[in-house]
Amino acid sequence: MSENPIPGYLPAEEGRRRRGAYAIPSLFTTANIFCGFYAVIAALKGYQALGTDLGEATRLFDNAAKAIGFAVLFDALDGRIARMTKTTSDFGVELDSLADVLSFGLAPALLAYAWGYGVTPDIYGLEMGKAAWVISFLYLVCGAFRLARFNVHARRTVTAKDRRQFVGLPIPAAAGLIAAIVHFSPTPLLAQSARSFEVWGNHVLVDSAVLGFLMLLLVAALSGLMISTIRYRSFKDLGVGALSPRWTLLLLSLLVAGIYFYSQWVLIFLASAYVVHGLAMKGLALLRLGRKEPASAEVSTPIKSEP
């Protein structure tokens, strides 16, 4: 005759099963940390190989960019798995933030420096060597601030709007754009040949110095977007049942096939589109607000009676 279990008591086997479930998201976070560490090492080795073996440097920079891309994937999976299995914990949140500082803060800042603006010539009177240090550090600090703000908001009462949107550009998206750019053209900027473009009838020469300066501006802009109040879609509301299994399978198949065969084009498009969509939605909101204000002012203006 079996005995009823004591209320609140978990058998040893069930307790081990629950602990194993809590470990699954942390395994993905650990994979995120590994990818970030690998990206840092690859970027450093690529920087060292610039003067001796350009082909090896190109390969290492591309590997660093791919590692950041895999870190983005693991970061997306660990949170979703934790929510699906109801194993979200304070430990997991803190570990995830520390992993993100490495994979999406330090690694892309170092990669942008080593592959891009840290080795390009001075331009417009700007000492690129000094500016590169400042902008890479700015990116890292803004990324850390962004993660700290996210953790503070996560401890507050979560509304439906909070689940649908992020405040500021998420640091994985910023890192993903930097990695996508490097993956799209892994040859270091210092070694890229100059290109001539015709703009409004004038020939514009774009050399490595100009490319480095543009990359510097982009990283600075990403830093500002991370600590801004511009809202971005989180897609957390898109659960497993948001689409029919047929459409889910079709979209996933197209995405995997696109990344496999055309990873450079697909990834840079997705990363750029996500960064731009927040700015576009903010612009549309300001435009709608500007149209409403004159109308409301016109309605609220009192009509003076004739004496």
Protein language model features and the residues they cover:
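Topogenic membrane-insertion module of multi-pass membrane proteins
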Residues: M1-A76, M281, P307
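C-terminal membrane-associated helical module and adjoining short loops/tails
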Residues: M1-E13, V158, R163-P307
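Select subsegments of transmembrane alpha-helices in polytopic membrane proteins
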Residues: P25-I33, S97-F104, V167-G176, L243-T248
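Multi-pass membrane catalytic core of lipid/isoprenoid biosynthesis enzymes
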Residues: L27, R59, K66, M84-L147
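Hydrophobic alpha-helical transmembrane segments of polytopic
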Residues: F28-A31, A64-A71, I135-L138, C142, ...
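Alpha-helical transmembrane segments of polytopic integral membrane proteins
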Residues: F37-V40, F70, F74, P108, ...
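Helix-coil boundary and interhelical linker segments in multi-pass alpha-helical membrane proteins
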Residues: Y38-K66, L110-V134, I181-L214, F261, ...
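C-terminal ends of transmembrane helices
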Residues: G79-D90, A144-K161, G168, I227-K236
